[in-house]
Design a protein with these regions (language model features):
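Adenylate-forming
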Residues: 301, 315-316, 334-363, 396-409, ...
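Conserved AMP-binding A3 loop
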Residues: 76-102
Length: 463
């Protein structure tokens, strides 16, 4: 209803749902096109038949498709945001938005017709659509589609992949797999020693020395791009010490999406790199630590939020888009993301807590698969907040590593590790309470934590 869509292409599993929707008076849906049906049926077109009809029209000299005039400033795609802290908004992007971003990426990322890109994330997500799919077409490279998250390493080998753009959790899993194999082979200590010896050497030299590890990934990888969430700087550094070129990129649906990206020549650990050529960035409302909200402008910035004037006015001010992300920018122009403005926890003493930063530390605890940092009100004073964490753990790993069997033993073992995390931070940041579960956190399709949904679930269970 919100998109006012008139036609939908769909696969068989959605047929019953879409048939019901079509006859709902609250929408403008006119056409259903099935990927699976071989023939047109009552009220439903077959994609197969539409292609045949189109071929006939072209043979008969029809040039409507080729001669169609495109207004590159008008909306050509609408995308629903993931809504990690609130309900989703409909982002309106134009041809100009997408194409300018493609050209920006192409000018800084070294990909050519000899490359093979592995597509993993859903293509309805703008990061995968632009970086993992359209960018490949634009550069004449080949795109291969993954068999699923569990098969990424196999796919890297099978398809001799050279470039992959994905989310941090995949790179963390791959790194964990490499480490386990080296431990099993009794080679880990030697590898770690050699990493330090080669710390000041070139990426090529490291690649030659760690050929065995590169072969685990197919032997052809020249670039890993991490996006959609923050990559743990420690993981990023370890990849690069092994001669694996991994960089971080940053963007949002509203920016088509790439705002900034690191390259092999211009790169700093923990940074999302510098802005792409046609995008400008600055900080507003900067605090004493040099952290402010990142605002950006350029031809890839969205037209606004479809049918939502209020939200558009809040985020799009003049030429600038207010990202809602807090960041630092150093003297050389490298951008460092600190966290989401809406997810920052403000304590009674006025100090700011960035949940993402603390979650990275908790996630390093052996047996912890993911975590969610939140503020818990301690009294009637709504500003009296203490830091708590919801920890998702791997039962088998925890039982083996900590020799803990009962819930009480598991809680005690993990909270001892939480105390170790606390000892590395100022006292005001200390985690005071913990919830344990084996149930995964609520996340978006690109593995971002849906903060409000998880907080609602915690509040519901406590009430």
């Amino acid at each position: 209803e919100r998109s006012e869509v008139e036609a939908i292409f769909y696969s068989k599993k959605y047929e019953d749902t879409l048939t019901k929707i079509k006859y709902n008076q609250n929408n403008k849906l006119k056409h259903l096109i099935s990927f699976d049906n071989l023939e047109n049926t009552d009220g439903i077109y077959s994609l197969n038949e539409l292609i045949k009809t189109g071929e006939k029209l072209i043979k008969n000299g029809n040039k409507e498709f080729i001669e169609a005039k495109i207004d590159n400033e008008k909306m050509s795609i609408m995308l629903f945001t993931s809504g990690t802290t609130s309900s989703s908004k409909v982002v309106a992007l134009s041809h100009k938005n997408i194409c300018s971003n493609l050209m920006d990426i192409a000018s800084v990322v070294d990909v050519n017709e000899n490359d093979t890109l592995l597509s993993i994330l859903p293509i309805h997500h703008v990061f995968e659509c632009t970086v993992g799919f359209l960018f490949s077409l634009y550069k004449g490279a080949k795109t291969v589609f993954s068999d699923g998250l569990r098969h990424v390493v196999d796919n890297l080998k099978e398809y001799q992949v050279t470039v992959m753009a994905c989310v941090p959790v995949i790179y963390e899993r791959i790194f964990g797999m490499i480490r386990k194999q080296l431990e099993k082979q009794g080679k880990l200590d030697n590898i770690l020693k050699k990493e330090e010896e080669l710390r000041n050497s070139s990426m090529e030299e490291r690649k030659e020395n760690f050929k065995q590890i590169h072969d685990m990934l197919g032997g052809k990888v020249k670039l890993f791009i991490s996006g959609a969430a923050s990559l743990d700087p420690a993981i990023e550094e370890r990849y690069r010490l092994l001669g694996i070129n991994i960089v971080q990129g940053y963007g949002l649906t509203e920016t088509s999406p790439v705002v900034a990206i690191g390259t092999n020549k211009e790169h700093k650990i923990g940074s999302i790199g510098k802005t792409v050529p046609s995008v400008k960035a600055k900080l507003v409302d900067i605090n004493k630590e040099g952290v402010g909200e990142l605002v950006v402008k350029g031809p890839s910035i969205a037209l606004g939020y479809y049918n939502n004037e209020k939200a558009t006015k809040e985020s799009f001010k003049g030429d600038w888009f207010y990202t809602g992300d807090l960041a630092k920018i150093d003297k050389e122009g490298y951008i460092f993301i600190c966290g989401r403005k809406k997810s920052v926890i403000v304590l009674k003493n006025g100090k700011n807590i960035f949940p993402e930063e603390m979650e990275n530390l908790v996630n390093k605890i052996e047996g912890v698969t993911e975590s969610f940092i939140f503020g818990k009100q301690q009294s009637d004073d709504k500003n009296d907040i203490k830091i708590n964490v919801k920890v998702v753990y791997d039962k088998e790993v925890v039982e083996n590593v900590y020799k803990a069997k009962t819930k009480e033993d598991i809680y005690r073992a993990i909270f001892e590790k939480i105390k170790e995390v606390n000892s590395t931070m100022p006292q005001y940041k200390a985690i005071r309470g913990m919830i344990l579960t084996t149930k995964p956190l609520i996340k978006t399709t690109t593995n971002k934590i849906k903060r409000q949904a998880n907080l609602d679930e915690i509040n519901k269970s406590e009430n």
